[in-house]
């Protein structure tokens, strides 16, 4: 059976995916078709469900590990292999016996296996995790595992202690996760060092006659990070070319306006002409680092970064990015960027690591060297395969302990596996874009985050009761004054 990894597909890819899904079942085609179109069809310029930062184009389309397709969806001999059930239909696999080193597990999205005696673990995709249907009652030997590499705005309740601690195993953007995905948008050390897109400084200086020093490309406006408010204020002090729908003042060439072109060589070369790229995440979370940060580094452009408070731990060198958090106001940031724009020697200190091909950050080098998955590498498993195998191996480890008469090991996630503070506005924030019909960011994201706390508490109470529940029960509990 063909291994179908999850990716945010563009319309042309959707057709190919749909064809493969038809080989599985019509039911899976409909279900996944809705799932993909809802969450993954949009622009590389957009965030969360719309953005390339949640776009795992780096998934390996041809998994490395062995997979044995089973002819019958339910033909698994009880007592033979542990069953690992994707409760979120992420992979589209109705049945696959996957080899994970010396261990093997049966992976499936078929929910009829929920009560099978050999079902040992349930896998959830964070964005798709909801209260409408959960595998309850949960038996003592049922592990829950969470895969969530995307923005917190996709599902805030996961980021609160009552919910994250429901899971035994995690794969998230946090370095503290069981399977850290912090470098999910960075292919390799070699890509960082590559000079393929580097435009010489003298050429950039000449291009400054028609280009601003800074470029901003976003089409998901007014996200929880309040980035558009900051950039809007920054524009009052320094020129910024903005190509996306947010604060747009410049247009891309017609052939690059299609979202499919956002990973195109021609688009990269447009960005590479600039001295600085505004690399602002859609949310502020520890270790939540997307292509917005890595892309300018690949292109030989200095990122002006706002997002993860822990970004300093992941810089290629101490002087490779300008951190917005180090400036008290956009006015000060603009003044500093103008200094670098006019002083070639000072500017070059920020690209010296690139020119010399020297990455001094040992944490980054170690993370890339030791991670068990690859990005756009046909010789390595993708991170979904690796996540599945991590759970499979842990299931087998406990099975062996029990065979020896020993108690099974208990794994449990904690709040460090997904940490994001509540959204905050910049002091100079102005009303949101017309797209939000006059609502401010505070009116949208902060109440959403605060309500998610109550949702997390309600969900935990219902899950601990260990009975199926309706959405009506859940929402009644969320809005109960005394809860």
UniProtKB/Swiss-Prot annotation:
UniProt topological domain (Lumenal) ranges: 32-483
Glycosylation sites: 110, 168, 318, 468
Alphabetical list of InterPro entries matching this protein: Alpha-1_3-FUT_met, Glyco_tran_10_C, Glyco_tran_10_N, Glyco_trans_10, GT10-like_C_sf
Entry-linked Gene3D superfamilies: Glycosyl transferase family 10, C-terminal domain
Annotated GO MF terms: alpha-(1->3)-fucosyltransferase activity; fucosyltransferase activity; peptide-O-fucosyltransferase activity
Reactions that this protein is recorded to catalyse: L-threonyl-[protein] + GDP-beta-L-fucose = 3-O-(alpha-L-fucosyl)-L-threonyl-[protein] + GDP + H(+); L-seryl-[protein] + GDP-beta-L-fucose = 3-O-(alpha-L-fucosyl)-L-seryl-[protein] + GDP + H(+)
Record EC number: 2.4.1.221, 2.4.1.-
Membrane disposition: Single-pass type II membrane protein
GO biological process: cerebral cortex radially oriented cell migration; fucosylation; N-glycan fucosylation; neuroblast migration; neuronal stem cell division; neuronal stem cell population maintenance; oligosaccharide biosynthetic process; positive regulation of protein secretion
A single Gene Ontology CC term: endoplasmic reticulum
Pfam families given in the database record: Glyco_tran_10_N, Glyco_transf_10
Ranges annotated as spanning the membrane: 9-31
Keywords on record: Disulfide bond, Endoplasmic reticulum, Glycoprotein, Glycosyltransferase, Membrane, Signal-anchor, Transferase, Transmembrane, Transmembrane helix
Spans within the Cytoplasmic topological domain: 1-8
Pathway, per record: Protein modification; protein glycosylation
Disulfide partners: 389-392
Localization annotation: Endoplasmic reticulum membrane
Region (Disordered), start-end ranges: 45-64
Role, per record: Protein O-fucosyltransferase that specifically catalyzes O-fucosylation of serine or threonine residues in EMI domains of target proteins, such as MMRN1, MMRN2 and EMID1. Attaches fucose through an O-glycosidic linkage. O-fucosylation of EMI domain-containing proteins may be required for facilitating protein folding and secretion. May also show alpha-(1,3)-fucosyltransferase activity toward the innermost N-acetyl glucosamine (GlcNAc) residue in biantennary N-glycan acceptors. However, this was tested with a library of synthetic substrates and this activity is unsure in vivo.
Similarity field: Belongs to the glycosyltransferase 10 family.
Name of the protein in its database record: GDP-fucose protein O-fucosyltransferase 3
Species name: Rattus norvegicus (Rat)
